[in-house]
């Protein structure tokens, strides 16, 4: 996909770098697989902000994605690739031999007209989905389940890829991009290849308004606030005179907050430190 740097015809265009995808479908999405999406503005049912920096943005409709890929043995043909405003990856509309259509995360290299297959006997080819116990060690995969039958949870964003490095007993060991080594049940499914649109990270927004189109609001520094609004607020100058904390007083910058001890034994090696 070409990277296009805009000419500085205005202040808002000067620093814009766009990723152009000429292969994407230019019409409407497939209507039976589209749902209404209600924006929360970062508020919960009491109207209180529970997620900061969220609000506004262009109206979006949710595309129902098939993360389970459970149509075993039924070949599907990729009809088209589409843009999805709800995720960084592109999606593919697949027409199966039984007449059903489903959206799936588009793998890198898959084009309109390609055939996709799921099941234990599917060939090892980009876009096909198999249980990890049927995938050769060393294969790069994406859209990986963490519980058999639950649907893909890992490696779903643009350019994501995970390597299957070992298989022992009922578990398979995966190497994530972060450097973390993690075990998952060998019956969990994964899709061969990596996720499409790896150039997604090369986009430069060029102006604040481009972030607002996505529903992302400004991030204000705590030290620029008043004491009533943030532990870093107030005082003379920019020094807040204490260890940095979140707006709720929890230490930040290295303080561990992970609570899920239940799955600690599945992590073989922690992710690389930056």
Curated annotation (Swiss-Prot):
Domain of life from the UniProt record: Bacteria
Annotated Gene Ontology cellular component terms: large ribosomal subunit
Any one Pfam family match given in the protein's UniProt record, by short name: Ribosomal_L2
Gene Ontology biological-process entries: cytoplasmic translation
Keyword Nucleus listed: no
GO terms of molecular function: rRNA binding; structural constituent of ribosome; transferase activity
Keywords per UniProt: Ribonucleoprotein, Ribosomal protein, RNA-binding, rRNA-binding
Annotated function: One of the primary rRNA binding proteins. Required for association of the 30S and 50S subunits to form the 70S ribosome, for tRNA binding and peptide bond formation. It has been suggested to have peptidyltransferase activity; this is somewhat controversial. Makes several contacts with the 16S rRNA in the 70S ribosome.
Protein name: Large ribosomal subunit protein uL2
Organism in which the protein naturally occurs: Thioalkalivibrio sulfidiphilus (strain HL-EbGR7)
Taxonomic placement: Bacteria, Pseudomonadati, Pseudomonadota, Gammaproteobacteria, Chromatiales
């Amino acid at each position: 996909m070409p990277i296009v740097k805009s000419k500085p015809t205005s202040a808002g265009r000067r620093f814009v770098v766009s990723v152009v995808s000429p292969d994407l479908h230019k019409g409407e999405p497939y209507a039976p697989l589209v749902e209404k999406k209600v924006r929360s503005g970062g508020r919960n049912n009491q109207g209180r902000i529970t997620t900061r920096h969220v609000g506004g943005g262009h109206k979006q409709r949710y595309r129902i994605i098939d993360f389970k890929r459970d149509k075993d043995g039924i070949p599907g043909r990729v009809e088209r690739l589409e843009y999805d405003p709800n995720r960084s990856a592109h999606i593919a509309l697949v027409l199966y031999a039984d007449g059903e259509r489903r959206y799936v995360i588009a793998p890198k290299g898959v084009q309109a007209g390609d055939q996709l297959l799921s099941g234990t006997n599917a060939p090892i080819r980009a876009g096909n989905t198999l249980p990890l116990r049927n995938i050769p060690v060393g294969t790069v995969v994406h859209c990986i389940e963490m519980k058999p039958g639950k649907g893909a949870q890992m490696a779903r964003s643009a350019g994501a890829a995970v390597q299957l490095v070992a298989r022992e007993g009922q578990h398979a060991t995966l190497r994530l991009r972060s450097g973390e080594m993690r075990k998952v049940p060998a019956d969990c499914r994964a899709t061969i290849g990596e996720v499409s649109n790896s150039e997604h990270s090369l986009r430069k927004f060029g102006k604040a308004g481009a972030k607002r189109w996505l529903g992302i609001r400004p991030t204000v520094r705590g030290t620029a606030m008043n004491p009533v609004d943030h532990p870093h607020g107030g005082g003379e100058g920019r020094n807040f005179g204490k260890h940095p904390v979140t707006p709720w007083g929890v230490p930040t910058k290295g303080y561990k907050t992970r609570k899920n001890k239940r799955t600690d034994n599945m992590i073989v090696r922690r992710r690389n430190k930056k």
